[in-house]
Amino acid sequence: MKTFLILALRAIVATTATIAVRVPVPQLQPQNPSQQQPQKQVPLVQQQQFPGQQQPFPPQQPYPQQQPFPSQQPYMQLQPFPQPQLPYPQPQLPYPQPQPFRPQQSYPQPQPQYSQPQQPISQQQQQQQQQQQQQQQILQQILQQQLIPCRDVVLQQHSIAHGSSQVLQQSTYQLVQQFCCQQLWQIPEQSRCQAIHNVVHAIILHQQQQQQQQQQQQQQQPLSQVCFQQSQQQYPSGQGSFQPSQQNPQAQGSVQPQQLPQFEEIRNLALETLPAMCNVYIPPYCTIAPVGIFGTN
């Protein structure tokens, strides 16, 4: 096909060349007959050059020589790549081998060592509890005498609020206030709330006994003497001041749930009077009624 196309192109070029030569010849003869010869020679040379230039078309034959493209077959020789893939699974084998590392067995061994010092810790806790109990007993003995002036102060304020006769005279009342404040300052902050509850509890017991005395038509005594006598009766041996529900058998079951409004009234009065009078901090949880104060009778 290529040879046929080349021959056809040559025929077309030859015909066009002959036509181009024939057309200008009759036009040039009438104008300048002397110049016709060089003009004829120029196109003749050009005509001779056309076939010469057309002849190099056959070098297109080397294109079929490009058939060596099948030389791409050597790419298939690159298949040895799967060969290096074989060693990759080989190093995976040593990874499961380091599993024999079992140092974890040594960890349970030191654990019994930690359990051993836990035993003296329990003994320390017992000692601390014993020390706390001893401190509470000491505080109870101290509170026996410290709560008496504070109780008298609250009784004085309670009697004034209800319009009854005063418990103490004004001169003695000022001294009682000073004693009460000095004693509250010595009480630890953690024990002040319970001390105030004991004061309220003692006041309620005092009121109950006073009502019983009135019912039995006993001789009435001044309230000041009754307070001091009852203070000696309630705290003769240091019992009943700090934990009346446990150490004072007379106080157990004495305050009934029906007396809760009265207890709250006196407690609020004590919380308003004592901290402001003595400039003492009372914890806010002191507004909660202590457990074991109210009996079931």
From Swiss-Prot:
Which residue ranges does the record annotate as region Disordered? 29-127, 234-257
Query: Low complexity bias: where?
Result: 29-55, 68-80, 102-127, 234-250
Question: Domain of life of the organism in this record?
Answer: Eukaryota
- Whether tRNA-binding counts among this entry's keywords is no
Entries under InterPro entries matching the protein = Bifun_inhib/LTP/seed_sf, Bifunc_inhib/LTP/seed_store, Glia_glutenin
Q: Which UniProt keywords apply?
A: Allergen, Repeat, Seed storage protein, Signal, Storage protein
Q: How is it modified after translation?
A: Substrate of transglutaminase.
Amino acid composition bias (Pro residues), ranges on this chain: 56-67, 81-101
Q: Keyword Repeat on this protein? A: yes
Q: Which organism is it from?
A: Triticum aestivum (Wheat)
Entry GO MF terms: nutrient reservoir activity
Coiled-coil regions listed: none
Q: Explain the purpose of this protein.
A: Gliadin is the major seed storage protein in wheat.
Q: Specify the protein name.
A: Alpha/beta-gliadin A-IV
